[in-house]
Amino acid sequence: MNVRERVDLARRHLAKSLELKGEHIGVIEMRRHFSCYFKGLPNFKETRLKLVTLYDIPQIYGLLDEIEERWGDYAPEAVSVYQQQ
């Protein structure tokens, strides 16, 4: 899945979170998920820190647009949530 697809999924996830939880809780709960959506992107630390500290919803959507523009076609290696033992 490339970054463009991940951004689209993150936008839909954010919209649902806002709808179900309200603006304040919805934004706060999405912060933990954003890191997972964009894990493995090169030089992403500064953008990630910004993404997980923003409260303003239009700014969050704007930053998602920037992520899509900058890394859009990049496809990081799939990361399993299950560790093999």
Indicate where each model-derived feature is located:
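Alpha/beta catalytic cores of nucleotide-metabolism and tRNA/nucleoside-modifying enzymes
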Residues: 1-85
